[in-house]
UniProtKB/Swiss-Prot annotation:
The gene is trpB. It comes from Stenotrophomonas maltophilia (strain K279a). GO terms for cellular component: cytoplasm. This is Tryptophan synthase beta chain. GO terms for molecular function: tryptophan synthase activity. InterPro entries: Trp_synth_b_CS, Trp_synth_beta, Trp_synth_beta/beta-like, TrpB-like_PALP, TrpB-like_PALP_sf. It is an enzyme of class 4 (lyase). Keywords: Amino-acid biosynthesis, Aromatic amino acid biosynthesis, Lyase, Pyridoxal phosphate, Tryptophan biosynthesis. It catalyses: (1S,2R)-1-C-(indol-3-yl)glycerol 3-phosphate + L-serine = D-glyceraldehyde 3-phosphate + L-tryptophan + H2O. The keyword Amino-acid biosynthesis applies.
Length: 405
């Protein structure tokens, strides 16, 4: 990965959906028309003040934005070094950042006259957020979820059903997020006339990476304004977990042109990158095409996607959003691996020091924030995106620690 200077990171993607050599649209001919229709509808909606007003109103009165920035004082004192601040996306309605995106896409679906939405989910948070907005707008909702993830996220599966969604188990492949995304795409090809596909991460063919980023960018815009208002300065470093990378790009985007702010993504190193049991696509992957876009993917020498592992269902994905691949190649962001064990230690530490249960996904970011803080003096600030709450993961953590609930 060779770094190259970029004058304005906000100028990307280009008109074809490319972030440098990444992104684009590599899809079957049957999807070209629907994607063009979606891109046109989205670009029109972005310019419509009425659409923006409806979105902003829902963020304020339904989601509960703005989410606060919280100074984790006791955690910072325990760790030593820089002060750790948390962007509290766990306090949103449904308990994670995912609803920022599903609200926007569901409003777009209604604007396009679609009556049915489909979604893929790993940890279940995107599925819950999709089912939530479908219920609010009176739309049919079908969620595809890997059978492996259904087993480790039973609470979220039940939440989706309570909200009126149909949850379809996916047993192909590793029965995790990538397989759920495959099945959702097949559904969309078949039912495109009345169906809107709400992708939950900044992956997929254009316009999805930019659309999902734009709907999540409220996180970084708020955080930047809050930092200046409350601290009179920007953070020295920011970090977020990266699977597909929607919460991360949501935080990162507002800071991309602030060159003094270090940006670090926390990938899922699983049992350790050297073991092969991980989901660190940038740290250990290579450029390839997955789910309609060119990005870093985990594959073998023949280009076949390999199975991934993470204690976190939401990070268990063999690719990454193309904008993250671009940021890595240009040197604007670093992407480092956090192991399962490091994430679990961070989970327990935040619970004990601050009374907050972070999602396992967010625990990876927290572990990275702790590492960054230890390297820095006390007068510096590390801002961590706490992308979701950990209620959904209690059974997984208990089982891993030999407890039966």
């Amino acid at each position: 990965m060779s770094a190259s200077p970029i004058a304005d990171y906000h100028a990307f993607p280009d008109a074809q959906g490319h972030f440098g050599r990444y992104g684009g649209s590599f899809v079957a001919e049957t999807l070209v028309g629907p994607l063009q229709e979606l891109a046109q509808a989205y670009d029109q909606a972005r310019q419509d003040p009425a659409f923006q007003l409806a979105y902003d109103r829902d963020l304020a009165h339904y989601v509960g934005r703005p989410s606060p920035i919280y100074h984790a004082q006791r955690l910072s004192d325990h760790v030593g070094g820089a002060q750790i601040l948390l962007k509290r996306e766990d306090l949103n309605h449904t308990g994670a950042h995912k609803i920022n995106n599903t609200i926007g896409q569901a409003l777009l679906a209604a604007r396009m006259g679609k009556k049915r939405i489909i979604a893929e989910t790993g940890a279940g948070q995107h599925g819950v957020a999709s089912a939530t907005v479908a219920a609010r707008l009176g739309l049919e909702c079908v969620v595809y979820m890997g059978a492996t993830d259904i087993e480790r996220q039973k609470i979220n599966v039940y939440r989706m059903k309570l909200l009126g969604a149909t949850v379809v188990p996916v047993t192909s492949g590793s029965a995790t997020l990538k397989d759920a995304l495959n099945e959702a795409m097949r559904d969309w090809v078949t039912n495109v006339q009345d169906t809107f596909y709400i992708i939950g991460t900044v992956a997929g063919p254009d316009p999805y990476p930019r659309m999902v980023r734009d709907f999540n960018a409220i996180v970084g815009r708020e955080a930047r304004e809050q930092m200046l208002a409350e601290y009179g300065r920007l953070p020295d470093a920011i970090t977020a977990c990266v699977g597909g990378g929607s919460n991360a790009i949501g935080l990162f985007h507002a800071f991309l042109n602030d060159r003094q702010v270090e940006i670090v993504g926390a990938e899922a190193a699983g049992d350790g990158i050297n073991t092969g049991r991980h989901a660190a696509s940038i740290a250990a992957g290579r450029p390839g095409v997955l789910h309609g876009n060119r990005t870093y993917v985990l594959c073998d020498d023949d280009g076949q996607i390999i199975e991934t592992h993470s204690v976190s269902a939401g990070l268990d994905y063999p690719g990454v959003g193309p904008e993250h691949a671009f940021l890595a190649d240009t040197g604007r962001a670093r992407y480092l691996g956090i192991t399962d064990e490091e994430a679990l230690q961070a989970f327990h530490l935040l619970a004990h020091t601050e009374g907050i249960l972070p999602a396992l996904e967010s625990s990876h970011a927290l572990a990275q924030a702790i590492k960054l803080a230890r390297e820095r003096p006390r007068d510096q600030i590390v801002l961590c995106n706490l992308s979701g709450r950990g209620d959904k993961d209690v059974h997984t953590i208990a089982a891993r620690e030999g407890l039966v609930l």
